[in-house]
Amino acid sequence: MEKKASILMNRYELGRMLGQGTFAKVYHARNLASNQSVAIKVIDKEKVLRVGMIDQIKREISIMRLVRHPNIVQLHEVMASKSKIYFAMEYVRGGELFSRVARGRLKEDAARKYFQQLIGAVDFCHSRGVYHRDLKPENLLVDENGNLKVSDFGLSAFKECQKQDGLLHTTCGTPAYVAPEIINKRGYDGAKADIWSCGVILFVLLAGYLPFHDSNLMEMYRKISKGDVKFPQWFTTDVRRLLSRLLDPNPNIRITVEKLVEHPWFKKGYKPAVMLSQPNESNNLKDVHTAFSADHKDNEGKAKEPASSLKPVSLNAFDIISLSKGFDLSGLFENDKEQKADSRFMTQKPASAIVSKLEQIAETESFKVKKQDGLVKLQGSKEGRKGQLAIDAEIFEVTPSFFVVEVKKSAGDTLEYEKFCNKGLRPSLRDICWDGQSEHPSLAQSSTLTQSSKSISRHAI
């Protein structure tokens, strides 16, 4: 970036460079309106386009918007010029955790605190269907209050990236921290791979060096694959037992987060984080649009705001056929281990009746209701394991007298969501669902809709 461009988008005053990589530079900056310190990540659009990293940048934006947690670096906003993409992010003053470990191993209580915060952040990511895949001390920052912040979601994956076998298959991560199943190029569970990396990090914090290290990369991979680790003499028995379960080369018997948080060593002095409020999920689409829209002014100009309306969802014949029984029971109401991201049901009731029914459910279950941008948002009042449960219901008009309602969890714990669906949502919505026994006349007449993909308008609320 040129030195003369000290004011960015009339919003930020750029300062010194904090670091740089192949495709981006990070600067300290000051918000001109609030005087708040931020970190500005500057990404070269041309380089990103040349190497085909557009999808990765889009995914990083979506993930950072999705994972709002006290121990995760927050994304404030996304801006762009014709040649650059700018991430305005939370500025973490303390620097990398790696630099602290480089000065020597940490005391057990200090290591435990960082590890507890790391697991809290990772568990939250997993609850949102996000796997980091590159956890290491260099990607863990420490703020001025000594709290850990997870950063760099550039290699992260969504749960939806899994193939038909339910596993991820992309090899990524830093060799010394990567799980055996990734090295062996088998399909892997992103959550279990992240837990392995957390185990390596805990070892490094307590020992001051890596558990698996060799000048020969293939020999290091052999040690990782076998879980061949030697503990230093100062490791306590509890630490050794915990690390043995974290660094188990068999992912099927490796300790899970649920078991980990109940471990005596982990529980000592543990204070769960106070969750942050979750943003409007439409910001994801706006930020992605901002980053890759070609119609932007240069650095000295103002960033162009994307359109506020969202593109209508398209449902084709196969979508409608799958809904012919009224409910898509496979996602919302079956006790599957893998919860679908969203579920739909069809109804002949008008939008006003649908909204009224959702408001009635919300009142019964002590949820707050917010109607915004074609969405009915239900916000739980109780703090759950992953913060407050939040559910979005979106209404689409197929014909003037036929509607599709899409329901999905936007925040909170999946198990708590399933419980709410089974005990609250499912019984209450039965009486407004289309039973599918008699063909809907106006739908039958709509031959163009049943033969090809057509847009369905979001009904105004």
Swiss-Prot record:
Residues 440-461 are annotated as: Disordered. ATP binds at L18, G19, Q20, G21, T22, F23, A24, K25, V26, K41. Its EC number is 2.7.11.1. Residues 152-181 are annotated as: Activation loop. CDD domains: CIPK_C, STKc_SnRK3. Residues 300-334 form the NAF domain. InterPro entries: Kinase-like_dom_sf, NAF/FISL_domain, NAF_dom, Prot_kinase_dom, Protein_kinase_ATP_BS, Ser/Thr_kinase_AS. Induction: By drought stress and abscisic acid (ABA). Its cofactor is Mn(2+). Residues 442-455 have a biased composition (Low complexity). Residues 340-369 are annotated as: PPI. The activation loop within the kinase domain is the target of phosphorylation/activation by upstream protein kinases. The PPI motif mediates the interaction with the ABI (abscisic acid-insensitive) phosphatases. CIPK serine-threonine protein kinases interact with CBL proteins. Binding of a CBL protein to the regulatory NAF domain of CIPK protein lead to the activation of the kinase in a calcium-dependent manner. Belongs to the protein kinase superfamily. CAMK Ser/Thr protein kinase family. SNF1 subfamily. This is CBL-interacting protein kinase 5. It comes from Oryza sativa subsp. japonica (Rice).
